[in-house]
């Protein structure tokens, strides 16, 4: 049996090599044949550039489920969209015969500058089923750089009747309250985003989808309904808190540490992985995903810096230490506060501290959350998370805010429109749409239910009154 299993695995690997058209200079990093799902995963990477490579995933029967090729194009030629479509169709017909006729092409093909996306979905009652069919990205030179096959729905749950739009709208609409906050409107997330912070109104309790017949099943009581955010407090200031401190020394980057790898994260930040050369290097037992992840995290310290300013923006330590918990919780709090002030000298103007709930067992780290506010208005994703080792006193986790609170100083914290005006704008743009929603129950895979989905602005700009919609 072992011999047969080996032959099968070699056959799958050879198939993945052919599908991915893997160049010989790439190194096989992951060769994982899965567990219960029996899927096979392969990853080849460039030894000179770990961000360049090819990933292939094969299903239980060896069929292609996904392909990702992130390598230099073989040709600089620019082909017509008709030719790109021909290449896509040949690829799909080779690996999933009949899929082109089984699914319907969506009309909103999207060009991403250097590639074109083709998307095919399963239709039911004239509406597309999300996460069905397949999608393919083809580079302008004619290479399949991404492919994902979802397949057909397992079952369709059809309602006995479909309520009309007005009835559904009345069923879903309810009184809504608004929170005032600062939010960074990212271009990658919002249709009118500009990557800048804005003062916005956000509706509380986002509306949810409802069955097309408006008959809702009884929901189990959700304990989260009674959840209340823990209270936050002004920063406790102590003598010497503003004394100059070196963040690098506080996270444990010691003399002799070596930079194992560095990567441009593509968002104005640089990621660096540090290692103590005296620590033994992890020796993987195989090329499974588990071994690969362990090899990437074994006794390393990961940091993120702003490419323009050099400021530390993130820390994640995987350096395990054994020993007694010699640093008290009070000392950990002081260390966390000193670290916070080292990065934000006027931290007391913007941050409040929130303590973790006490566990029954003593933890090896003490964690603290710092919530950002400006003129009393909270900043979405403005939280800072700092964890301190009770063994070493080093910072083991630092998760910085989405934006430096100092940059909010130029934004008027007083809204130009009232809450009532924001509500009026919100309801002007609120509507419902009929569509299929994928179910994730335990009994049936890939089943779909017809629902009414609310469509509404995620935010209302508190200065201009402009509604802010998500791209998706």
UniProtKB/Swiss-Prot annotation:
The record's section on InterPro entries has: YcdB/YcdC_rep_domain (IPR032599)
The record's family statement is: To B.subtilis YcdC.
Question: This protein is called what?
Answer: Uncharacterized protein YcdB
Protein source organism:
Bacillus subtilis (strain 168)
């Amino acid at each position: 049996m072992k011999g047969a299993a080996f032959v099968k695995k070699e056959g799958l690997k050879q198939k993945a090599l052919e599908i991915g058209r893997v160049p010989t200079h790439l190194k096989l990093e992951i060769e994982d044949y899965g567990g219960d799902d029996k899927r096979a995963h392969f990853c080849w990477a460039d030894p000179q550039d770990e961000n360049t490579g090819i990933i292939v995933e094969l299903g239980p029967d060896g069929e292609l489920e996904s392909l990702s090729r992130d390598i230099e194009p073989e040709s600089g030629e620019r082909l017509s969209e008709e030719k790109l479509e021909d290449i896509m169709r040949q690829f799909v017909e080779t690996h999933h015969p009949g899929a082109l006729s089984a699914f319907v092409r969506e009309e909103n093909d999207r060009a991403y500058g250097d590639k074109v996306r083709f998307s095919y979905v399963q239709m039911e009652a004239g509406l597309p089923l999300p996460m069905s069919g397949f999608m393919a990205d083809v580079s302008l030179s004619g290479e399949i750089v991404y492919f994902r096959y979802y397949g057909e729905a397992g079952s369709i749950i059809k309602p006995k009747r479909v309520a009309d739009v007005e009835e559904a709208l009345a069923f879903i609409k309810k009184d809504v309250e608004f929170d005032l906050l600062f939010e960074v409107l990212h271009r990658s997330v919002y249709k009118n985003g500009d990557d800048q912070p804005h003062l916005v109104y956000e509706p509380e309790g986002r509306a949810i989808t409802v069955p097309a017949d408006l008959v809702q099943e009884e929901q189990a009581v959700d304990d989260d309904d009674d959840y209340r955010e823990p209270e936050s407090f002004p920063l406790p200031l102590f003598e010497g808190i503003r004394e100059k401190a070196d963040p690098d020394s506080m996270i444990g980057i010691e003399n002799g540490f070596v930079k194992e790898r560095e990567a441009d994260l593509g968002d104005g930040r640089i990621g660096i992985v540090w290692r103590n050369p005296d620590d033994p290097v992890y020796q993987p037992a195989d090329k499974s995903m588990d071994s690969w992840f362990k090899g990437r995290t074994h006794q390393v310290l990961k940091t993120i810096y702003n490419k323009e300013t050099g400021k530390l923006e993130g820390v994640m330590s995987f350096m395990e230490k054994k020993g007694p918990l010699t640093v008290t919780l009070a000392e950990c709090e002081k260390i966390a506060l000193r670290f916070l002030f080292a990065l934000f000298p006027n931290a007391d103007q913007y941050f409040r501290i929130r303590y973790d709930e006490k566990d029954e067992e003593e933890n090896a780290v003490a964690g603290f959350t710092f919530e950002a506010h400006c003129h009393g208005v909270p900043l979405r994703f403005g939280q800072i998370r700092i964890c301190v080792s009770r063994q070493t006193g080093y910072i083991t986790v630092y998760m910085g805010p989405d934006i430096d609170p100092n940059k909010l100083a130029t934004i008027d914290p007083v809204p130009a429109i009232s809450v009532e005006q924001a509500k009026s704008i919100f309801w002007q743009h609120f509507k419902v749409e009929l569509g299929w929603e994928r179910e994730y129950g335990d009994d049936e895979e890939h089943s779909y239910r017809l629902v009414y989905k609310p469509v509404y602005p995620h935010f209302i700009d508190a200065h201009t009154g402009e509604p802010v919609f998500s791209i998706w």
